[in-house]
């Protein structure tokens, strides 16, 4: 009876993506417990037990991945700021070796870090909200995983873009800067890749619990309550407020010459990102 139950549990664990050392550990602990009690019926149906393990492992793993992703991206953000701060005067945008690739790399260097920063913070916000939960709905975990994936992907794109930018515009950049850019990009991509591997491993586990995913307003409710704009439940009002704030910062930083152009660009980019990724990242329902 016990051996048959263990075979059923092994199959059910595999069905929800629990394999390898995790499955062997669960089966060993289950076998010890059943041999002590001898009561298979009271232990629970194998499918329900497997689903419970999947929910708990996916929740804890996704939460760890969220923090790991942020820790991988934080030094990347510092390195990005230092690298760009070292450029006194940027090269002529039309001086790239392969102009379409050069312009694409320049746009990536501008946009990808902003996406990585925003989604990284959103990932941590969701993980922090779920910090005391043992198991959460599959939809919640899906949002957490997608945010981490976009944050890591954007971070990797940013430093790939920097490396390409350094190559494409090497004629207009100091040689020491291009060398530094290549070295820093390679170093930064290592922890990002490590976090991505951890995310991929966690994504193999398929949680079974049903329930709503929640949205941005659930993640940052305490902060929104401090803002007198009645933002809760009004995602586009929140989006426009953020877009205006980002555009204002770009206007001030760019000065009278480039400020207006940069402000319009940032405003459109924020709104487009919210429209395109809002539901995917759980920012709005």
Residue ranges and their predicted role:
Residues 1-71:
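Negatively charged linear elements and acidic catalytic determinants
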Residues 60-285:
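Hydrophobic alpha-helical bundles in membrane proteins
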């Amino acid at each position: 009876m016990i051996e048959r139950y263990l075979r059923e549990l092994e199959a059910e664990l595999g069905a929800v993506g629990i394999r390898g050392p995790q499955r062997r550990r669960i089966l060993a602990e289950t076998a010890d417990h059943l041999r002590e009690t001898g009561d298979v019926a009271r232990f629970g149906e194998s499918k329900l037990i497997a689903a419970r393990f999947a929910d708990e492992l996916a929740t804890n793993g996704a939460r760890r991945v969220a923090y790991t992703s942020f820790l991988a991206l934080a030094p990347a953000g510092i390195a990005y700021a230092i690298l760009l701060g070292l450029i006194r005067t940027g090269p002529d945008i039309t001086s790239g070796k392969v102009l379409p690739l050069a312009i694409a790399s320049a746009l990536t260097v501008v946009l990808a870090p902003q996406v990585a920063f925003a989604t990284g913070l959103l990932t941590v916000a969701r993980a922090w909200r779920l910090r005391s939960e043992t198991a959460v709905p599959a939809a919640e975990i899906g949002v957490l995983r997608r945010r981490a994936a976009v944050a890591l992907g954007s971070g990797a794109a940013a430093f790939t873009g920097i490396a390409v930018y350094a190559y494409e515009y090497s004629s207009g950049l100091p040689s020491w800067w291009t060398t530094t850019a290549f070295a820093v990009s390679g170093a930064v991509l290592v922890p990002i890749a490590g976090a991505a591997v951890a995310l991929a491993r966690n994504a193999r586990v398929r949680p079974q619990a049903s329930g709503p995913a929640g949205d941005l307003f659930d993640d940052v409710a305490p902060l929104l309550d401090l803002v007198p704009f009645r933002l809760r439940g009004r995602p586009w009002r929140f989006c426009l407020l953020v877009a205006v704030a980002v555009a204002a910062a770009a206007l001030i930083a760019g000065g009278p010459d480039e400020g207006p152009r940069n402000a319009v660009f940032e405003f459109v980019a924020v709104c487009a990102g919210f429209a395109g990724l809002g539901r995917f990242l759980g920012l709005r329902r």
